[in-house]
């Protein structure tokens, strides 16, 4: 499964590096992709989607399968809210939220949920033939 990520402060990049996935691209590297992917992003300001992520999704949302978001619990209701906004705007599941660069349990949860999405997508693709 392809993981596309945006890491303004480095937290999301550190999280991605701890997962078992090697098929990962930054937003810049993913420009022009034409395959299913999961996006992982941080949240900026008062619970907003970073502009580069919004612009990327405006061009490439057709293959978006799910989202995961990083945030800081100090922001209360705005914690990792970019994930909520992407999920509702693009009608994809929010896999999870994790704080800053995540902990070991977050990494395990992410790995499991990405596998579930990947298996579901594979079944749906096979059944459509």
Swiss-Prot record:
Organism domain of life: Bacteria
Pfam hit, one: Flavodoxin_NdrI
Any one GO MF annotation of this record: FMN binding
GO biological process: protein modification process
Function, in words: Probably involved in ribonucleotide reductase function.
UniProt family annotation: Belongs to the NrdI family.
Name the record gives this protein: Protein NrdI
């Amino acid at each position: 499964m392809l993981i596309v990520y945006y890491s303004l402060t480095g937290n999301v990049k550190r999280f991605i590096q701890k997962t078992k996935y090697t098929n990962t691209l930054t937003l810049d590297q993913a420009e022009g992709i034409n395959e299913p992917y999961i996006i992982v992003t941080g949240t900026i300001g008062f619970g907003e989607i970073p502009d580069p992520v919004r612009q990327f999704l405006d061009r490439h949302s057709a293959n978006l399968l799910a989202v995961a978001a990083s945030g800081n619990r100090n922001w209360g209701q705005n914690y990792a809210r970019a994930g909520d906004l992407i999920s509702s705007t693009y009608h994809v599941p929010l896999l999870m939220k994790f704080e800053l660069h995540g902990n070991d349990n977050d990494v395990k949860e992410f790995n499991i949920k990405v596998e579930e999405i990947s298996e579901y997508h594979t079944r749906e693709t096979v059944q459509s033939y």
